[in-house]
């Protein structure tokens, strides 16, 4: 009798455990990816590219004013399950306040949760987080200024590019300023810019360069070349990048 009852309990448990495992799996999927779902296309605001006419910006034939702010951390938070909802909360609040443009990072080079792990090698998980940021901004009618590298060491920056070239034995100098004049480092960065421009957003289906959500591109955050205070090195370096695509 006891043996029979025990057998029934084991049988029930044998069915119960897979159900628990499956439920836990569903919970994991929801917590990990639940916030990735962006509203359906009909709920997403339609945006057109902002154009310039003289000294004035226009969108859809109307004067467009930049009321903006800086939230550099969007991609960094979007890749983290626990902090991801903060991106949506910030965009919702900004839209209610009438803000129109947000500046944020589109880079993280060689650091924790790096977008670019090494030259030309990317973490798709982090790229999808950036996809989400752009899609969420579009949903709330917010345009973005995407910055492509840091002059400072945080998030890798130009220091990381110089380090990569130096480690491969092709760097001209260990100076951080060689980012601006070393042809191998410039090649690294141009390839990075091209990859970002031609990235097809996994949420919207648009390549970044074709997405009117992106108001502008910023080549580098707080650029400075300490070895050339005239600014000539910076100017020559930047003149090369419009041809990336």
Predicted regions and their residues:
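Short, low-complexity, Lys/Arg-enriched N-terminal segments of secretory-pathway carbohydrate enzymes
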Residues: 1-12
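Generic signature of intrinsically disordered, low-complexity, basic-rich segments
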Residues: 7, 19-23, 90, 133
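Membrane-interface recognition of transmembrane alpha-helix starts
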Residues: 11-19
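Hydrophobic membrane-insertion alpha-helices, especially the h-region
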Residues: 18-32
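Low-complexity, Pro/Ser/Thr-rich intrinsically disordered segments
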Residues: 34-43
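Active-site mouth of glycoside hydrolases
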Residues: 42-245
